[in-house]
Amino acid sequence: MYRVRSMESTATSSPSSSLMVHPTNFRVIIVGGSIAGLTLAHCLSKIGVDYVILEKRQQIAPQEGASIGILPHGGRILDQLGLFNAIQRNVEPLTTAHISYPNGFTHTNQSPTLIHERFGLPLAFLERRKLLQILYWSLPDTSRVQVGKTVVSVDHIWGDSGMAVRTRDGSTFYGDIVVGADGVHSRVRHEMWRLAEIDLPGSITEREKDGMTVDYICVFGISASVPDLRPGEQVASLHDGRSFLVFPGKDGRVFWFLLKKLDRRYTYTSAPRLTPLDIDTIAGSFISDHIWNGVSFGSLWERREVTGVTNLEENVFSTWHSGRIVCIGDSMHKMAPNTGQGANCAIEDAAALANAIHGAIEHVDRPSMAEVQSFLRSFNESRLPRVREIYKSASVVVRLHARENLALRLVGRYYLPYSGDVPANTASKLIADGVQLSFLAPSLHSGPGWEKYSMKNGVAKSTVVWTSLGILGLVVFLFLLFRVRARFSSF
């Protein structure tokens, strides 16, 4: 018999909010103790919604060598939740961006400082592990997070009155909706597809299921302090077929990524199976590559503290929900790390879903199946256009950084260094329309950029068009110029 457990007590409100919360009989099963999953848990706590998090690993925040960028739109949501101050204590805000090229040419701009001034929140970089720890330990009730719970199946309860989630250890969890926040290899996504095929055959096409591809692999890590790499100054080092992203952070620790193009495009299922044994082989090929200011990749490598390797899956799925199941974060959109948007999109997903849930239960204690499907559909439709735009930007930048073709090499070398505030403006347009939590007071950190660079007004849109036309014109000009030369010199 399906029975919903009520919340323990009224959740504490955000320091920046006077929201009065009232526990409801609506229960959410969150699969995955990820950034998306834990952020959603904080949001649900604020509106009195019962939840449980099922995490397959034995600990929430293992040391895996990964790092995370928090941009103003992600930071604004975390600030609404009363979490950003804890994050600020663990970061060195970015102020300067350096770009280096294979021929030794370098360029510096102040995009991070401009973005901070425009939006009132900095670009911050920290260990993924540290962010997970902050999200976990600041929960009102950590007992709602259950580790060692590997999900094996998700099913409807008879009569469509709820969902049952079963785990490998034999446990069963019941709730009104299931949220898949379990990453790129999502089990919930698989179960959503399975149930959708039963309920409405063909509703999720094979083309959609096979949409995720892999063009790049990434070796990433954290190194001890490297002389001549200054905290707060990020570096993008561009090479043919690969790039390095370097972020000197708090206490001199350096977060870095080596992104390497593969020999061809792979599908998700056919991509190389990487293991820790591959790390030394991949990294060892590029030890002598110049990064910045006399620093080579070898300087980072010899000071490495922890490393990892992964395929860089790329895709935005179209269908994020079916029935009472909805997926968020990397389970629905996976993008290259070059624009730092992955975690921020996941945080936005959690906030947008919480807004939808809050709207659905505001006047109804337990929404019906039709009402659940309605608000999940609206959530899906509202998120898709924005995430696609952010994804496209990341897709272009990872290829620009790896100088993937002639046009991108020309743009990267002969347009980007002389483009003024265009990089900051482009980033600002993607930041400005970020989601806010509708049920909490706005962040006290603000700036003129939220309004000025919003894509909801015609000025920002026309700026995008003219910038694109300018780049296109420059590419055509440079292409014609270089065509008359018998050989291309190094650039």
From Swiss-Prot:
GO biological process: biosynthetic process
Cofactors that this protein relies on: FAD
Residues noted as binding FAD in the record, renumbered to the chain: E55, G69, R128, D330, A343
GO molecular function, one term: monooxygenase activity
Pathway: Secondary metabolite biosynthesis; terpenoid biosynthesis
Superkingdom of origin organism: Eukaryota
E.C. designation(s): 1.-.-.-
Sorted UniProt keywords: FAD, Flavoprotein, Glycoprotein, Membrane, Monooxygenase, Oxidoreductase, Transmembrane, Transmembrane helix
Protein's membrane topology: Single-pass membrane protein
Pfam families xrefs: FAD_binding_3 (PF01494)
Glycosylation, residue list: N380
Transmembrane residue ranges: 462-482
SUPFAM superfamilies hit by this protein: FAD/NAD(P)-binding domain (SSF51905)
Any GO CC annotation of this UniProt entry: membrane
Subcellular location: Membrane
Biotechnology: Chevalone E derivatives produced by this cluster are interesting candidates for cancer therapy since they synergistically enhance the cytotoxicity of doxorubicin (DOX) in both MDA-MB-231 and MCF-7 breast cancer cell lines.
Function summary: FAD-dependent monooxygenase; part of the cluster A that mediates the biosynthesis of chevalone E and its oxidized derivatives that possess a unique five-membered lactone ring and can synergistically enhance the cytotoxicity of doxorubicin (DOX) in breast cancer cells. Within the pathway, cle3 takes part to the biosynthesis of the molecular scaffold by catalyzing the formation of an (S)-epoxide ring at the terminal olefin of the geranylgeranyl group.
Family designation: Belongs to the paxM FAD-dependent monooxygenase family.
Designated name of the protein: FAD-dependent monooxygenase cle3
